[in-house]
UniProtKB/Swiss-Prot annotation:
Membrane-spanning parts: none
UniProt KW keywords: Ribonucleoprotein, Ribosomal protein
GO MF terms held by the record: RNA binding; structural constituent of ribosome
Taxonomic lineage of the native organism: Eukaryota, Metazoa, Ecdysozoa, Nematoda, Chromadorea
UniProt-listed InterPro entries: Ribosomal_eS19 (IPR001266), Ribosomal_eS19_CS (IPR018277), WH-like_DNA-bd_sf (IPR036388), WH_DNA-bd_sf (IPR036390)
GO process annotations (BP): ribosomal small subunit assembly; translation
One term under GO cellular component: cytosolic small ribosomal subunit
Entry protein name: Small ribosomal subunit protein eS19S
Similarity comment: family membership: Belongs to the eukaryotic ribosomal protein eS19 family.
Amino acid sequence: MVKQPSVKDVDQHEIVRYIAGFLKKSGKVKVPEWSDLVKLGITKELAPVDSDWYYVRTASVARRLYIRSPTGVGALRRVYGGNKRRGVTPNHFARASGSVIRKALQTLEAIKWVEKHPDGNGRILTKQGRKDLDRIASQMRQNTKITLEP
């Protein structure tokens, strides 16, 4: 019996793209109207260039919750943070925008992929979310096998 591939068995960049595509096609995810104006953190000068950045960030948060759960907004702010350029002084680490991450988590809660942890220690992936992510990973694995074979 062959084990179904999980999110951990596939390339992280590709699975995030596949999940983002799934979220966009499904129509369940509503992009906030402020998404074209916002910066993703204090470390950025401009808003994201990619018009689908909200789907990608939401997919990345879902993958992160699959890998390490429970996780809160503060931990995700550290994950998505970066170096703040301060001119001639040395760079300094700064966290990402908490509002963007919070809205992504609320979006995942609305489609029933994520729920709040009973102890209040962040959020966890639901059984439905885990099942959908595993299904996307197995479809991705099948598509790459088909294209790689001669």
